[in-house]
Protein backbone atom coordinates (compact mmCIF):
# COMPACT_ATOMS: atom_id res chain seq x y z
CA UNK A 1 0.00 0.00 0.00
CA UNK A 2 1.25 3.46 -0.89
CA UNK A 3 1.93 5.81 2.00
CA UNK A 4 0.04 9.08 2.15
CA UNK A 5 2.03 12.05 0.82
CA UNK A 6 1.47 15.80 1.16
CA UNK A 7 2.43 16.07 -2.54
CA UNK A 8 -0.43 16.21 -5.04
CA UNK A 9 1.08 13.83 -7.58
CA UNK A 10 -1.48 14.54 -10.31
CA UNK A 11 -0.91 18.30 -10.05
CA UNK A 12 2.86 17.74 -10.12
CA UNK A 13 2.47 15.47 -13.16
CA UNK A 14 0.36 18.04 -15.04
CA UNK A 15 2.77 20.87 -14.19
CA UNK A 16 5.71 18.81 -15.46
CA UNK A 17 3.90 18.23 -18.76
CA UNK A 18 3.17 21.95 -19.16
CA UNK A 19 6.79 22.89 -18.48
CA UNK A 20 8.25 20.18 -20.73
CA UNK A 21 6.06 21.23 -23.65
CA UNK A 22 6.97 24.93 -23.53
CA UNK A 23 9.56 25.85 -26.17
CA UNK A 24 12.70 27.05 -24.41
CA UNK A 25 15.84 26.84 -26.55
CA UNK A 26 18.98 28.50 -25.17
CA UNK A 27 18.88 32.32 -25.38
CA UNK A 28 15.16 32.21 -26.28
CA UNK A 29 13.49 31.25 -23.03
CA UNK A 30 10.93 34.11 -23.02
CA UNK A 31 7.88 31.82 -23.27
CA UNK A 32 8.82 29.65 -20.29
CA UNK A 33 10.10 32.65 -18.29
CA UNK A 34 6.74 34.39 -18.68
CA UNK A 35 4.92 31.22 -17.61
CA UNK A 36 7.18 30.76 -14.57
CA UNK A 37 6.86 34.42 -13.54
CA UNK A 38 3.07 34.11 -13.64
CA UNK A 39 2.95 30.80 -11.73
CA UNK A 40 5.47 31.84 -9.08
CA UNK A 41 3.68 35.15 -8.52
CA UNK A 42 0.37 33.27 -8.16
CA UNK A 43 2.05 31.13 -5.48
CA UNK A 44 3.03 34.24 -3.53
CA UNK A 45 6.69 34.60 -4.49
CA UNK A 46 8.25 37.96 -5.34
CA UNK A 47 9.73 37.54 -8.84
CA UNK A 48 12.20 39.76 -10.65
CA UNK A 49 14.23 39.36 -13.83
CA UNK A 50 17.81 40.54 -14.18
CA UNK A 51 19.46 42.10 -17.27
CA UNK A 52 21.44 39.03 -18.38
CA UNK A 53 19.55 38.89 -21.70
CA UNK A 54 21.15 42.12 -22.91
CA UNK A 55 24.59 40.87 -21.92
CA UNK A 56 24.37 37.51 -23.74
CA UNK A 57 22.21 38.40 -26.74
CA UNK A 58 19.22 36.45 -25.46
CA UNK A 59 15.60 37.41 -24.93
CA UNK A 60 15.37 36.47 -21.25
CA UNK A 61 17.28 37.27 -18.10
CA UNK A 62 17.60 35.13 -15.02
CA UNK A 63 14.53 34.90 -12.80
CA UNK A 64 14.97 35.50 -9.09
CA UNK A 65 12.03 34.35 -6.98
CA UNK A 66 11.83 34.87 -3.23
CA UNK A 67 9.45 33.54 -0.63
CA UNK A 68 9.79 34.94 2.89
CA UNK A 69 11.11 32.40 5.37
CA UNK A 70 10.24 31.76 8.97
CA UNK A 71 12.25 33.05 11.91
CA UNK A 72 14.63 30.43 13.26
CA UNK A 73 14.55 28.17 10.20
CA UNK A 74 17.43 27.65 7.78
CA UNK A 75 16.95 29.24 4.34
CA UNK A 76 16.71 27.12 1.19
CA UNK A 77 18.19 27.95 -2.20
CA UNK A 78 17.19 26.35 -5.48
CA UNK A 79 18.83 26.94 -8.87
CA UNK A 80 17.72 25.56 -12.21
CA UNK A 81 17.80 26.13 -15.96
CA UNK A 82 14.91 27.38 -18.07
CA UNK A 83 16.50 26.39 -21.38
CA UNK A 84 16.35 22.92 -22.86
CA UNK A 85 18.50 20.95 -25.29
CA UNK A 86 17.41 20.12 -28.84
CA UNK A 87 14.75 19.45 -29.75
CA UNK A 88 13.59 22.39 -27.64
CA UNK A 89 10.50 23.17 -29.71
CA UNK A 90 7.44 21.13 -30.64
CA UNK A 91 7.93 18.63 -27.80
CA UNK A 92 4.92 16.49 -26.85
CA UNK A 93 5.26 14.51 -23.64
CA UNK A 94 4.06 10.92 -23.75
CA UNK A 95 3.82 8.32 -21.01
CA UNK A 96 3.73 4.57 -21.38
CA UNK A 97 3.16 2.21 -18.48
CA UNK A 98 3.58 5.02 -15.95
CA UNK A 99 6.88 6.29 -17.34
Locate each region found by the language model.
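A non-catalytic alpha/beta surface segment that caps or lines the substrate-entry region
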Residues: 25-72
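Generic hydrophobic, helix-prone segments enriched in Leu/Val/Ile
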Residues: 16-19, 38, 47, 93
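Intrinsically disordered, low-complexity segments enriched in polar/charged residues with Gly/Pro
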Residues: 5-6, 50-52, 78-81
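N-terminal capping segment at the start of a domain
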Residues: 2-30
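Active-site metal-coordination/substrate-binding segment of hydrolases
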Residues: 33, 59, 66, 72-99
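Flexible, active-site-adjacent loop/turn segments at secondary-structure boundaries
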Residues: 17-20, 54, 83, 91
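Short amphipathic alpha-helical segments, especially helix-boundary/capping motifs
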Residues: 9-14, 40-41, 92-98
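Metal-dependent amide/peptide-bond hydrolase catalytic core
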Residues: 1-2, 42, 86
Amino acid sequence: MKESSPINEERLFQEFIKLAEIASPSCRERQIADYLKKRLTELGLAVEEDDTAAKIGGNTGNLLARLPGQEGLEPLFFACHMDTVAPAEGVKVSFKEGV
